[in-house]
Every structure is written in C-alpha cells, then in structure tokens.
C-alpha cells in the first residue's frame, strides 16, 4: 500500500502544475525545515524557525549538538523518506497556504504575520504555533493507508491525507485568531455548533476549490448519510434537550472528532454538530448575504439563539 502513496500525490502534482500556469496564483514562503535538517543544511542557530521547531522536540537550550542529535533521530530517519515520496517539494503547501492567506485578506480576516515551515516530528499536533512560527508536520498527511497510522482508529486516519492539509491550515489559522470565547450560561451547545459552522464556512471560503465533504472531514458515504438524515438528527438534538445545554462535555460530544455521535443517532458520524452548525449558518447567509466572516466569528454573532431564529432553519 505504501507504494500507492506517490500515486496519491500524482493528482496533486497535476493540480499544482495547472495552478502554476496561472500567474496570479499567490504562493506563501514556506521553509522546508525537515528537508534541510535531513540533508544536513541546518539554518543558523539564530533562525527563528529553527529555534521554534527545536522547542517542540526538546526542552534543552539550542546548541549545535542538540540539532545534530535530532538529525539522527528516529523521527527524521523514518518519516523523511516517506514525506519526500508524497510531497516532492513545498509547492503544494506553499500554494495552498498562499491561496488561503490571500482569500483571508480579501475577506477582511485579521491574521497575524507569521513564518511558515514544514517539519516532521513525533508530536500529535499536525499544525502547531510556536510564537510567530506556524509549523506544519507533513508526517501527519501521508495517506489514510499509511502503515504508520495503522494503530489509529479509522476516523482519525481519514483525516491524514494530503487533501486534508489545506483545510487544516485554514482552520488552524482562523481558529487561533478567532477562538470560541463564550463562558458560563452563554456557552451553549447551540453557540458552539454555530461557531463550528462558521469555521466550516471559513474553510469553504478560504481554501481554493473547496469541497464541503473535505472541509468537514467526511467521506462521500458519510455526506450522503448526513444529507438523508439531517431532519432526524436535528429532531434528536431538540428531543434530547441538547441545544441549550451548557455542559462543555455535551458540546464536545457533538462537535469534537470521534467515531460517532451516539447521543444523537447511533450511526451519526463524529462532529455531526459541526455539520448542523454549518447548515444553520448557510441558511442564515441565504437571507443575510452581506454578513462577513469577521462578524460571524465574533462572540456577539454566535451567542444566544438569534442566528438560529433569523436563519429560519427548519428540518
């Protein structure tokens, strides 16, 4: 199965080649730090990117000896060849990130200026912010059938593909700058669902050529199930009195990654609350097309039930 991974990337190469013929396609500057380290071309110790990365793999002060030790680490020796077989260069990441940042600026989102680098490491985070640096761990995107992911549950492996990378980049950038910020009685499951719906709308707006199933992390079969059962899902949320529940655990059960959301429907895929939130936000935008992403990402927007009422969402 590992030999199939270059074929997965082949379609990405073709897509990038087509994009490269468009002179107006923005490209972000991305430092291929993992590649530099593997090749022994380590940036100067004053490098902001290198310092940020080494803080994620060691608590020791940065020294040439520490970098050399990391260069011979198992993570570098195991992941680097596999990453190189899927991502032959930084073009895919650079173009994806460039398009996202350009669209974010056009949409009026205030994202801080950062440096960007691709890395490999053994941490669980696929995207990590360290001070002003955004680290993208490419060893998290080697394909759902990658042998190194075999011990992970299926629902997690489905998001470990090159196609998922742009959506993760967009969500990380937006959610870090516009986090969910309600507390106490205002932090209802409904408000969290709407916020997650806005995040999904943001990904659809920022990622070039976005697909809803990919933005939500669902297979085609899961998307069909959700579309066919949306009404029963919504009625179950209402019937079980989950909508205005202020327990953080209830909201997490609805929107956090998981194999299923049995509290709603035994067959409901994980994060079903995010799907319903997106449907509510889409209904709202149908009647309020002038609403902007910065407005919708503010707590004043997703607080209370006004968005639900004004969306006239019915199922």
Q: Residue spans of the language-model regions?
A:
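Sec-dependent signal peptide recognition
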Residues: 2-7
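N-terminal mature-domain "stem" immediately C-terminal to a signal peptide or N-terminal signal-anchor/transmembrane
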Residues: 17-78
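Acidic/His/Gly-enriched intrinsically disordered linker/tail segments
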Residues: 200-261
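Residue-level recognition of alpha-helix termini/interfacial anchor residues
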Residues: 46-60, 224-233, 240, 288
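Acidic/His-rich structured neighborhood in mature extracellular/periplasmic domains
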Residues: 74-223, 293-294, 298
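C-terminal motif of bacterial Sec signal peptides marking the signal peptidase cleavage site
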Residues: 12-15
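C-terminal soluble interaction/assembly domains
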Residues: 247-315
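Structured segments of extracytoplasmic/periplasmic soluble domains
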Residues: 36-40, 103, 107-110, 205-209, ...
């Amino acid at each position: 199965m590992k030999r199939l991974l270059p074929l997965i990337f082949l379609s990405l190469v073709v897509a990038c080649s087509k994009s490269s013929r468009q002179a107006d396609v923005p490209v972000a500057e991305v430092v291929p730090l993992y590649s530099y380290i593997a090749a022994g071309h380590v940036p100067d110790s004053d490098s902001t990117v290198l310092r940020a990365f080494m803080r994620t793999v060691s608590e020791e002060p940065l020294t040439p000896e520490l970098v050399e030790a990391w260069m011979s680490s198992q993570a570098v020796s195991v992941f680097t060849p596999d990453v190189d077989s899927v991502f032959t260069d930084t073009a895919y990441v650079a173009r994806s990130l460039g398009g996202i940042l350009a669209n974010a600026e056009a949409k009026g989102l205030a994202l801080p200026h950062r440096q960007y680098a691709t890395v490999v490491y053994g941490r669980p985070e696929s995207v990590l912010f360290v001070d002003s640096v955004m680290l993208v761990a490419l060893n998290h995107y080697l394909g759902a059938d990658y042998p190194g992911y075999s011990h992970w549950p299926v629902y997690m492996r489905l998001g470990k593909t090159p196609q998922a990378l742009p959506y993760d980049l967009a969500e990380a950038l937006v959610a870090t700058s516009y986090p969910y910020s309600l507390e106490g009685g205002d932090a209802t499951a409904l408000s969290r669902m709407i916020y997650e719906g806005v995040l999904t709308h943001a990904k659809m707006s920022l990622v070039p050529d976005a697909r809803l199933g990919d933005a939500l992390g669902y297979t085609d079969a899961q998307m069909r199930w959700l579309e066919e059962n949306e009404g029963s899902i919504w009625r179950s949320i209402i019937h079980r009195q989950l909508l205005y529940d202020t327990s953080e655990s209830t909201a997490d059960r609805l929107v956090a990654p998981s194999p299923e959301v049995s509290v709603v429907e035994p067959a409901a895929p994980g994060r079903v609350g995010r799907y319903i939130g997106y449907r509510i936000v889409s209904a709202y935008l149908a009647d309020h097309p002038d609403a902007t992403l910065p407005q919708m990402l503010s707590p004043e927007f997703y607080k209370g039930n006004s968005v639900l009422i004004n969306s006239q969402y019915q199922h």
